[in-house]
Curated annotation (Swiss-Prot):
Domain BRCT: 592-672
InterPro entries hit by this protein: BRCT_dom, BRCT_dom_sf, DisA/LigA_HHH, DNA_ligase, DNA_ligase_AS, DNA_ligase_CS, DNAligase_adenylation, DNAligase_N
Keywords carried by this UniProt record: DNA damage, DNA repair, DNA replication, Ligase, Magnesium, Manganese, Metal-binding, NAD, Zinc
Gene name tied to this protein: ligA
EC number: 6.5.1.2
Keyword DNA repair tagged: yes
Record GO biological process: DNA repair; DNA replication
Species of provenance: Myxococcus xanthus (strain DK1622)
One Pfam family recorded for the sequence: Nlig-Ia
Annotated protein name in UniProt: DNA ligase
Binding sites annotated in the UniProt record for Zn(2+): C412, C415, C430, C435
Role this protein plays: DNA ligase that catalyzes the formation of phosphodiester linkages between 5'-phosphoryl and 3'-hydroxyl groups in double-stranded DNA using NAD as a coenzyme and as the energy source for the reaction. It is essential for DNA replication and repair of damaged DNA.
Length: 672
């Protein structure tokens, strides 16, 4: 065996190993190796492909980052039509569905399979000789859009099939499924967008659909998409299944992720499954809007066939919506720190899902036009789980006779500067360089917990400082005197002293916090950390080329251009120099080489008395550790403060080492 043959054999072995570890981590949430071990395997494969370029195949795990942007999506004709399910909304509909099935099949009772109905985007995937070669959206059911490059970026989707139990992989296999975003990932995505000054997504489905249909796969790669598969198209080499459950287990054996399911005997069994699903819907890690009910027996399915574009053998039993109707009292425009003009509906307060809702974002002009929300309208408002409230629909029959469409402003409502659309045409921004509304939001961000952490500098104080003209730039904050502060509303001696002390403390900061505090568009906390590691001093960014910035971890071409433009702008350079001259001293990141936290995954839970959660996170990261948001078998330590909840319980179940606050502080001191 020559060198190339050895390299090819090792590459195939690495494909299999990495696919196995991806499945354990992204599907089962039960990893067998550490991040460092996984990265070592990936680097070995990358090195092999660099030495032997012909080994870099489209299904290689190294190709998940996404290729070049496309001008438009190609069309894909589906091998078999992608049909959609009919909906039912009450028990009567379920009873009628079961009666029809029993009558057509001629049996007194039917076995069903019940699955959570994901609120995602339907897809078709094609594998040839076990390698993923094409993926498409449903489209009109006959023809969909080719989104292969974007689907390659989804970590839970295997690029190659490595079956268990010596199952033979068909030469051609087409499977159907759904792309979605998990709740925790959606929450993190919106938090990141908020950090970066970008408009929030309304719900996980919108985020998933928008992410999958990005023309630039690198944008999709930055979004935390997941996938479940639930169907495969009959073909040569594909087993003939007796039941749907048998089919699901076959997909699972091939290494494809499947949703949870439950077998139900007859109508009463489905009712019990529905009641259990409805009761436990908020416990699931993803949003569901109902339960899919399918006949389990494959022969019965063939006999039942389909009507129009829906199968007779399946139905979507929708959950009652968590929606309430209320009145739109007004529509206003909110100006963000990056100048984005966001329409906001001010509502007559109403309780939705146990929470009082008085405002709902309308996201942007296109969304406002699509829904045609107007002042005085009666609307339905939905709030699902942790998702921000959104207006679902307008009750047109109750629309006032004198209502008029909302006129989106051509100028900023605060500074009257011209408002222009972004390159993608979705967001309208104020162009005013000295817009007071932007300045207020920028100061709020500058003082926020992850930035300079200036305690006592909140929304109202920021607005007062700007409106009185005392603060026109960040550096002006450090020139404030106690006498200046005492002239402001609701500011006494003690409050003024505390704020001055907080401002003084904030001067001793980190480069990561400092870069994040500047409010650069697209730059959240994680990107600020990566930039700080690459450029320990801000002045280095003044001299950095676009290529230098593009080499920073997780910085894509669009973000790199924005960052480069920001630091080339003389006004921004002047603002940074003014802050440094005012005494702000951003410390360069320290790289830990030893100690109990190096390379460890730590989860923080509960309230701590000796420091804030953010301070604890910084201390762990400064010592070479990584703070994760959830507990898994990969977690090395869980630091449990007061009133620790589900994370502590999971750590106990998994046998993860648990530290109380005192033990954690002692570990920090021994590794100071």
């Amino acid at each position: 065996m020559d060198d190339f043959q050895k390299a090819a054999a090792r590459a195939r072995e690495l494909h299999r190993e990495l696919a196995h570890h991806n499945y354990r981590y992204y599907v089962l949430d039960s990893p067998e190796v550490s991040d460092a071990q996984y990265d070592k395997l990936m680097r070995e494969l990358q090195d092999l492909e660099a030495k032997h370029p012909s080994l870099q195949t489209p299904d290689s795990p190294t190709q998940r980052v996404g290729g070049a942007a496309a001008e438009e999506f190609g069309e894909v004709v589906h091998r078999a039509p992608m049909i959609s399910l009919a909906n039912i909304f009450e028990d009567q509909g379920l009873t009628e569905f079961d009666e029809r099935i029993r009558k057509l099949v001629g049996l007194p009772g039917i076995a069903y399979v019940c699955e959570p109905k994901l609120d995602g985007l339907a897809i078709a995937l094609r594998y040839e000789k076990g390698a993923f070669v094409q993926g498409a959206t449903r489209g009109d059911g006959t023809t969909g859009e080719d989104v292969t490059s974007n689907l390659r970026t989804i970590r839970s989707l295997p690029m190659s099939l490595f079956p268990q139990d010596d199952v033979k992989v068909p030469d051609v296999l087409e499977v159907r499924g759904e792309v979605f975003i998990r709740k925790k990932d959606f929450q993190k995505l919106n938090e990141k967008r908020e950090e970066e000054g970008e408009p929030l997504f309304a719900n996980p489905r919108n985020a998933a659909a928008g992410s999958l249909r990005q023309l630039d796969p690198r944008m999709t790669a930055a979004r935390p998409l997941s996938v479940f598969l639930y169907e495969c198209v009959p073909g040569e080499g594909v087993p003939v299944f007796k039941t749907h459950i048998e089919k699901l287990e076959y997909l699972k054996t091939l290494g494809l992720p499947i949703n949870q399911y439950r077998r139900a005997e007859g109508l009463e069994g489905v009712r019990q499954a529905y009641d259990a699903s409805l009761k436990g819907r908020h416990e699931l890690p993803f949003e569901v809007d109902g339960m899919v009910v399918k006949v389990d027996d494959e022969d019965q399915r063939k006999r039942l066939g389909q009507v129009s574009k829906s199968p007779r053998w399946a139905v979507a039993y929708k959950f009652p919506p968590e929606e309430e109707s209320t009145e739109v009292m007004d529509i206003g425009i909110q100006v963000g720190r990056t100048g984005a003009l966001t329409p906001v509906a001010h509502l007559k307060p109403v309780k939705v899902g146990g929470v009082t809702v008085a405002r709902a974002t309308l996201h942007n002009e296109d969304e406002l036009r699509r829904k045609d929300v107007r002042k005085g309208d009666t609307v339905f408002v939905r709030r699902a789980g942790d998702v921000i409230p959104e207006i679902v629909s307008v009750v047109l029959s109750k629309r006032p006779a004198d209502s008029a469409p909302f006129e989106f402003p051509k100028h900023c409502p605060v500074c009257d500067a011209v408002a222009t659309k972004d390159e993608d045409g979705a967001i309208i921004r104020c162009t005013g360089a000295s817009c007071p509304a932007q300045l207020v939001e920028k100061i709020r961000h500058f003082a926020s917990r992850l930035a300079m952490d200036i305690e006592g500098l909140g929304d109202k104080l920021a607005a007062q400082l700007v409106s009185t003209g005392r603060v026109k730039a960040f550096a002006d904050l450090y020139a404030l005197t106690k006498e200046d502060l005492l002239t402001l509303e609701r500011m006494g001696d003690k409050s003024a002293d505390n704020l001055i002390a907080s401002l003084e403390r904030s001067k001793q900061t980190t480069q990561r916090r400092f870069l994040y505090s500047l409010g650069i568009r697209h730059v959240g906390d994680a990107t600020a950390k990566a930039l700080a590691e690459a450029f320990p001093r801000s002045e280095m960014l003044f001299e950095a080329s676009l290529e230098d910035i593009s080499r920073v971890k997780d910085v894509g071409p669009i973000m790199a251009q924005v960052i480069h433009t920001f630091f080339q702008e003389p006004q921004n350079q002047e603002a940074i120099r003014a802050l440094l001259a005012a005494g702000v001293q951003p410390a360069a990141p320290q790289v830990a080489t030893g100690g109990p936290f190096v390379g460890k995954s730590v989860v923080l839970t509960g309230a701590m008395t000796g420091m804030t959660r953010e301070q604890a996170k910084e201390e762990v990261e400064r010592r070479g550790g990584k703070v994760a948001g959830s507990v898994s078998r990969k977690t090395d330590f869980v630091v449990a403060g007061e009133d620790a909840g589900s994370k502590l319980k999971k750590a106990q179940e998994l046998g993860v080492r648990i530290l109380d606050e005192q033990a954690f502080l002692q570990m920090l001191q021994t590794n100071a």
